[in-house]
Amino acid sequence: MHSRNEPAVGLGTIATRLAALAAASDSRWSITFLDSHGAVFERCGAAELAARVAAVAGFLDRQSAPGAPVLLVFQPCVDFLVAFLACQWSGRLAVPINPPRRHRLIQRLQSVAADSGAALALTGGGVAEQSARWQADSAVLRAIRWHDVADIDTDPAQAGLLHEVDPGATCFIQYTSGSTSLPKGVEVSHANLMADMALMEAAWGLSPSSTMVTWLPAFHDLGLIFGLLQTLFSGCPVVQMAPNSFLQRPVLWLEAISRFRGTHTAAPSFAYDLCTRRAAPEQREGLDLSSLVMAMNAAEPIVPRVMENFVDTFGAYGFRRETFAPAYGLAESTLAVTASPVAVAPKFFTLDAAALEDGRIVPESAAARRTVIAGCGAPLADVTIAIVDPATGRRRPPDRVGEIWVGGPTVARGYWRRPGESFATFGIHIAGEDDSIGYLRTGDLGAMIDGELCVTGRIKDLIILSGANHYPQDIERAAQAAHPALRVDGGAAFGVVGDDGTEQVVLVQELERTQRRGDPAPIFSAISAAVWQTLELQVSRIVLVEPGAVLRTSSGKIQRAANREAWRDGTLAVIAEWRMARDATREAVSATAASQPPGDASTLDRWLREWLSRRLDLPLSDMLVDRGVGELGLTSVDAVDLAGAVGAHVGRKLPQTFAFDHPTINAMVAHLSGSAPAPPVAPATPRLAPGSGEDLEQLLSMIEEDGRG
């Protein structure tokens, strides 16, 4: 199904670009692959690459029919690029997918293999031996013919001819998010791909004189299209390393930029944070990042503080603030939708948080709560963005949040073999407007501010409590800032319906590896207090899990719906769990209260701490006398019950606002005993979340878990 945004067809294909580079005597294009120490492992020029591609294309001609899907299952290596381009050369459909590192991830490979209908798979980088084990456990994988690219005959006489293809035909299938058992493949046409790369080239100033440096996984759209294919389109050299090499030693990425005078690079937010945290001063010595023209930041969420910290750390080594280029994109629109201009510092917008929760864009002014959002740049040339009410399909006013709809030549053909979902997602028209443009519904929420797209969340992720909208990212960040044992960007907040029919908040949160055996009670307390203090809402359940247990897409985006299902199914690797034990404790607490005689200040102090400890299901040690009871997790219902229980205990009627009028245990005791109230204590400020910092296993998990990019 087409989106009615017909791409330009005069750009050729990526295979014809390769052929032109191979024939040019002055071509600068080459790919240099670095090993885990930063040494050159392999280098290949355009002519050699074209010869290798033609050899594999000839093999595909002998093994399959034009238009057939071909699985590409590779460890990071140059042979992946050879195989992908061989599919383009021969008119086959490339289906890139990462090889599973662990047995539990084979299901993803099986699902993609079955959904794509591939009968042939190309492998490389040591995957051939692994594939034999996978086939032993899977009838689906046994039905596929597996071939290592290294074993294919390179005799020029066997080389395949460059096929002429319809620019509107499918070029490759990019599998996106969904549960691991039901992946969705986006059909990207040759014209889609070439149009997106032409727009990115114009937006970010790529040319044959540029140099790309990338560690991004090639099975994912950002690493595949921007990291590799864009260099062929623009004719510039690329320096590549494996994701594992970066994760083990993040400064290796920066060293490669410095050494090869990289001009363009891209990474999710966590990578910049990882460099800031992991690159010791002695490792930074000698770095020169002044050659960089742009460093794309394309992960969601884009955290302004991460960019500020990176500039503060690496500004002394030539990195400029205006080098950062936040962007927004998705596989359904090939890759990029927006672009921040080159040599212009990113825009950050400080907004009224309460208004944003209500779907309104209001500058902070004197707002009690504020939130800072990064602009993701303006729409690429020829790309149209509309902010639409997802319920009515009508365009939203400029100061309102709505669903992001995208139109233009980069919008993909649809979902592979899913006409129903394609019809509901692609080629949609805005209600009440006479417009020939058919839009892509992204499922993302956002608004245009000062000409830039600002992404605020996902439609399905919204949590509605008492009529107010809450973004899970806000809850996750507030929680992760509360305690050093919690992994930043390692949590998933989602709404569930409680036994009483009301929406409740559940937070699944990863612990740092070194904190797994500690006492979880202070962590539960810190999370509850921070979320209350920051957002004035309660978390009903907190689930602490192993590092890497939170489900993510291949680009690191939290899959909140998948985590909710995993929590319900009991399949998460849980370390400890806390729940606000309301009904279970209410009766016991009331009985305890009735049995306790009133007393002096010290007795009242003890009684109040015990009552709150039981009611909130928190350890007694957390009932600090100068800590706000709201921070502890006391709700308005709890406050009314507390007033009644205290009144019964001391033998006098208290107003239902007792806990709000006297918000600490000290203040309550002072009021009840008749002594002067304790001076108010300013609430503690939680530590700022530094961004998307994760250790090796968590990042490897991110790379393995495929899904929406």
List PLM regions with ranges.
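Conserved AMP-binding/adenylation subdomain of ANL enzymes
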Residues: 194-211, 218-263, 278-283
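N-lobe entry segment of adenylate-forming
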Residues: 1-62, 135, 140, 601, ...
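Conserved ATP-binding/catalytic segment of the ANL
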Residues: 374-384, 390-399, 403-465
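AMP-binding/adenylate-forming catalytic core of the ANL superfamily
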Residues: 121, 258, 265, 408, ...
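Flexible, low-complexity inter-domain linkers and amphipathic docking helices that mediate domain-domain
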Residues: 1-7, 504-505, 511-513, 518-525, ...
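Gly/Ser/Thr-rich phosphate-binding loop
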Residues: 262-266, 278-370, 384, 392-394
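Conserved AMP-binding/adenylate-forming core of the ANL superfamily
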Residues: 31-85, 102-110, 162-164, 185-194
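Conserved pre-ATP/AMP-binding loop-to-beta segment of ANL
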Residues: 27-29, 146-147, 154-175, 181-182, ...
